[in-house]
Regions:
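N-terminal, intrinsically disordered, polar/charged segments of Gram-positive cell-envelope systems
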Residues: 33-89
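C-terminal soluble interaction/assembly domains
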Residues: 271-340
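N-terminal Lys/Arg-rich, disordered targeting/topogenic segments
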Residues: 1-11
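Soluble non-cytosolic domains of exported or imported proteins
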Residues: 86-89, 106-117, 222-223, 301-305, ...
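Zymogen propeptides
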Residues: 92-109
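Extended substrate/cofactor- or partner-recognition/assembly subdomains adjacent to catalytic sites
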Residues: 92, 109, 116, 121-293, ...
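Hydrophobic membrane-insertion alpha-helices, especially the h-region
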Residues: 14-30
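Sec-exported extracytoplasmic/periplasmic mature domains
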Residues: 100-104, 117-128, 233-237, 315-319, ...
């Protein structure tokens, strides 16, 4: 009888303790959420991390960047010193979220710092022109991906953002088009070979030997001929396609990326064909076999600007982030965004 009473007393005591501690737990949780909202902001876009480039509309981005340069604001908005600091702080919070979306947190710090400068350049360029900002990873998504490593990863990104505070890439006093991609074909591309009217002399070829041995460098796809033709007809509904031989690569740039491809007598852009068939890059070859069509693609991404894989290798060799950026963006300089 005494044992039962003792057991019942312990149960009541445990229940009372839980009731008393519950408000404390809820308050602590709410404070944590409020703190994260204060640190991160609430305007993040739910995204999934990929070491890819913003390629869904690369031509549109390039054209928009050129228009941005033509319409630079003659007068800057006047703010107080406090107002400017608040604005800069808000931008730096966005940079952390953008970088979390654009590159793996396991990369060397100097590689991440280089990505911070790229992200800040593209963000300020978009803000100045009033165009779409780079995609951000929300705090909730960060917690989901990083799990128990959340605090460690957050602090690593935060230190990289702070180490490059306010730094952007400039050419002739304006923001550059800071293109980047995951893995090149073995060298990056000259922008002038794809768009002759693109005034981007800083986007020129850089050797990336390390990319040729990177995981994900080589992709091989096999299609049944019927399947291949169906995919091509879906992408080019006006083309009268009856056999794979009607698709022929016409030209490549110096980095071996396809620039022009003939589809049933009509010529199209290599990047357009790449996206239509969901290939990892426009550095590809097409081979018709007995009953199949084989496509071999090299690299991941459009191949312009910084190769994240080679940037990682350069960091391992001792390059700092400034040297990494100089390697990929010839003639561009690092400046402070607030000085424009």
């Amino acid at each position: 009888m005494g044992r039962r009473r003792k057991k019942r007393t312990n149960s009541w005591f445990t229940g009372i303790c839980l009731i008393l501690l519950l408000p404390v737990f809820i308050t602590t949780l709410m404070q944590r959420m409020q703190l994260e909202n204060l640190i991160y902001g609430k305007d993040g876009v739910q995204g999934v991390f990929t070491t890819a480039d913003s390629e869904k509309n690369m031509e549109g981005e390039i054209r928009q960047h050129l228009e941005n340069r033509k319409s630079l604001l003659a007068e800057q908005t006047e703010t107080t010193d406090d107002g400017r600091k608040e604005e800069d702080d808000a931008v730096e919070i966005k940079i952390l979220q953008i970088v979390a979306q654009e590159i793996g947190v396991d990369k060397p710090p100097e590689t991440i710092k280089a990505q911070c400068v790229i992200a800040r350049t593209n963000l300020y360029d978009a803000m100045q022109a009033g165009t779409k900002e780079p995609e951000k990873m929300t705090p909730e998504r960060q917690q989901e991906l990083w799990g128990e490593n959340y605090d460690k990863n957050y602090q690593k990104l935060k230190s990289c953002v702070e180490a490059t505070a306010g730094e952007v890439l400039l050419y002739d006093g304006t923001y550059i088009y800071a293109a980047y991609h995951a893995i090149s074909s073995g060298r990056t591309r000259n922008m002038s070979e794809l768009y002759e009217d693109a005034d981007m002399p800083y986007l020129v070829m850089s050797e990336c030997h390390a990319d040729t041995t990177a995981e994900g460098y080589l992709s091989v796809f096999y299609y049944e001929k019927k399947e291949f033709l169906e995919k091509c007809r879906a992408a080019y509904p006006d083309a009268e396609l009856t056999e794979p031989g009607q698709i022929e690569i016409k030209s490549r740039d110096a980095a071996e990326y396809v620039t022009k491809i003939n589809v049933a007598g009509e010529t199209y852009d290599g990047e357009q064909f790449r996206h239509a068939l969901e290939l990892p890059s426009a550095c590809f070859s097409i081979t018709e076999m007995d009953s199949h069509v084989r496509i071999v693609a090299k690299g991941m991404g459009h191949g312009f600007g910084l190769s994240q894989n080679t940037a990682e290798e350069l960091a391992k060799e001792g390059y700092d982030y400034r040297e990494i950026l100089e390697y990929f963006y010839k003639g561009a300089v690092i400046g402070q965004a607030g000085n424009l």
